[in-house]
Curated annotation (Swiss-Prot):
One of its GO terms (molecular function) is hormone activity. It is linked to Hemochromatosis 2B: A juvenile form of hemochromatosis, a disorder of iron metabolism with excess deposition of iron in a variety of organs leading to their failure, bronze skin pigmentation, hepatic cirrhosis, arthropathy and diabetes. The most common symptoms of juvenile hemochromatosis at presentation are hypogonadism and cardiomyopathy. Residues 1-24 form the signal peptide. It is found in: Secreted. This is Hepcidin. Liver-produced hormone that constitutes the main circulating regulator of iron absorption and distribution across tissues. Acts by promoting endocytosis and degradation of ferroportin/SLC40A1, leading to the retention of iron in iron-exporting cells and decreased flow of iron into plasma. Controls the major flows of iron into plasma: absorption of dietary iron in the intestine, recycling of iron by macrophages, which phagocytose old erythrocytes and other cells, and mobilization of stored iron from hepatocytes. Has strong antimicrobial activity against E.coli ML35P N.cinerea and weaker against S.epidermidis, S.aureus and group b streptococcus bacteria. Active against the fungus C.albicans. No activity against P.aeruginosa. InterPro entries: Hepcidin (IPR010500). The keyword Iron-sulfur does not apply. Keywords: Antibiotic, Antimicrobial, Cleavage on pair of basic residues, Disease variant, Disulfide bond, Fungicide, Hormone, Secreted, Signal. GO terms for cellular component: extracellular region; extracellular space.
Length: 84
């Protein structure tokens, strides 16, 4: 019984090895196609993020200057100090 389980494990290992070797021969063609598309995708992604970064930059002016909250207002830890 132990011999049959060893044979089964060896066959499974051989099958996995063959599967990994055959999948490696398929991927180089596909990875070459993906490499050709990446520069265009990066440019499109950067263009789509730029308006969001510009909006964030405008909103940053609304953050309070005083980061430390002294607890002078009703909302504790709000980040805005009423005394300054």
């Amino acid at each position: 019984m132990a011999l049959s389980s060893q044979i089964w494990a060896a066959c499974l290992l051989l099958l996995l090895l063959l599967a990994s070797l055959t999948s490696g021969s398929v991927f180089p063609q596909q990875t070459g196609q993906l490499a050709e598309l990446q520069p265009q995708d990066r440019a499109g992604a950067r263009a789509s993020w730029m308006p969001m970064f510009q909006r964030r930059r405008r909103r940053d002016t609304h953050f309070p200057i005083c980061i430390f909250c002294c607890g002078c207002c009703h909302r504790s830890k709000c980040g805005m100090c009423c005394k300054t």
